[in-house]
Amino acid sequence: LHSGAGFGKSSALAQYFYDTKEAFSWYSISEEDDNILPFLRYLVHSIRRVVPTFGSSLLEDNIHFIYPKETELTRWYSLFCNELAIINTPFTIVLDDYHLVDHVFHINYVIEKIIEFLPPSINLVIASRIRPKWTVLLKLKLNGQLVELKEQDFMFSEEEIQVFFED
């Protein structure tokens, strides 16, 4: 989901999960989360809301690099994906306000790799003010694995506006 501020991305997602009662983890990203290490920890803890044992190997790992090398990033997303692969519970991971960390290479690198190896029982929803520039998005779109909601999808039609004010 990508659209400007105030278009209702977060509200629409919250309403969807309330209505469907589907299992989900929700990570509301803040400006302070623009470092890969806290980002991964917060992501793991958000998933633990659905799967309490998730991420033990990541949290036990001695992650202390301020500027991790590609080998460390590869190890982290491998551990993360391995932990996702053993989850039997279907659920959705929501990353809300992703635009706040979209400029961080390490976060984009890890998220793009996670998307590539995401098990079929787990969905990932990104809510952002801008469309991420990941190369994997084109592949997903061509394979019919990407649902993209844009700003126009959040705008009311004239009929919807009329119904809104009549109710």
Name every feature range the model reports, one short phrase each.
Residues 1-28, 41-45, 131:
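P-loop NTPase Walker A phosphate-binding motif
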Residues 57-94, 101, 112-118:
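Mid-core helix/loop region of P-loop NTP-binding domains shared across ATPases and GTPases
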Residues 11-15, 92, 105-167:
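Alpha-helical sensor/transducer elements of the RecA-like P-loop NTPase core
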Residues 37-60, 81:
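Conserved NTP-binding/hydrolysis module of P-loop NTPases
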Residues 32-33, 99-103:
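Short acidic, S/G/P-rich loop/turn micro-motifs used as interaction or catalytic elements
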Residues 2, 95, 128:
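Short beta-strand/turn micro-motifs composed of small residues
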Residues 2-5, 25-35, 60-66, 151-152:
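A short hydrophobic beta-strand->loop->alpha-helix junction that borders the nucleotide-binding pocket
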